[in-house]
């Protein structure tokens, strides 16, 4: 909840200070530091998958197709139309959001529910990850309904994929 509220508050703050993604980046970095510090201080790295894998590196080659899929937005080229500061803020957001969402949905939520029922944990983690993106309709990001619904469906599918990899 804190993550969603802070990220939603960041959009109007970005506009108010006139620096695109500056508040978003600051909130993301702060939350990442707090969460990682908590996990490390309580020795929870292994529990939440933040440690060296016991799986041989060679088996990670099976994930190469996922990297190809993830790069889909770059297939037609990329143009950076941002100042270096804005680009840095956007990159910080992307990296921190990825970390935060993985730890929240796959680490905390999935791990808590999986103690009782793996099937429910997979479904709940995937669906809440997807449904969580509905906030983009209300947080001032400017996303229209159809785009947001597509994002939700895609996020549920990606959430399912990522939780099966995590498990």
Task: Locate predicted features.
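Alpha-helical transmembrane segments in multi-pass membrane proteins
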Residues: 1-39, 58-59, 63-64, 84, ...
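Aromatic-anchored segments of alpha-helical transmembrane domains
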Residues: 2-8, 67-76, 126-136
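Functionally important transmembrane alpha-helices
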Residues: 148-167
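Structural signal for the C-terminal ends of transmembrane alpha-helices
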Residues: 36-45, 71-77, 165-166
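Hydrophobic cores of alpha-helical transmembrane segments in multi-pass inner/ER membrane proteins
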Residues: 27-38, 65-68, 97-104, 159-160
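Membrane-interface helix/loop boundary segments of multi-pass membrane proteins
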Residues: 100-126, 140-141, 164-167
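Membrane-interface helix caps and helix-loop-helix hairpins in membrane proteins
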Residues: 74-85, 138-146
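Hydrophobic alpha-helical transmembrane segments
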Residues: 59-64, 88, 119-124, 149-153
């Amino acid at each position: 909840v804190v993550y969603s509220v802070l990220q939603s508050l960041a959009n109007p703050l970005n506009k108010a200070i006139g620096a695109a993604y500056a508040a978003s980046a600051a909130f993301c970095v702060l939350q990442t530091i707090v969460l990682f510090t908590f996990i490390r201080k309580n020795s929870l790295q292994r529990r939440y998958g933040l440690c060296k894998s016991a799986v041989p590196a060679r088996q990670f080659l099976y994930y190469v197709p996922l990297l190809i899929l993830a790069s889909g937005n770059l297939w037609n080229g990329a143009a950076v139309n941002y100042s270096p500061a804005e680009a840095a803020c956007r990159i910080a957001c992307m990296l921190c959001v990825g970390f935060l969402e993985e730890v929240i949905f796959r680490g905390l939520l999935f791990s808590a529910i999986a103690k009782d029922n793996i099937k429910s944990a997979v479904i709940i983690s995937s669906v809440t990850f997807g449904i969580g993106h509905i906030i983009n309709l209300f947080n001032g990001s400017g996303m229209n309904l159809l785009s947001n619904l597509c994002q939700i469906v895609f996020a549920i599918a990606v959430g399912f994929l990522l939780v099966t990899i995590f498990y």
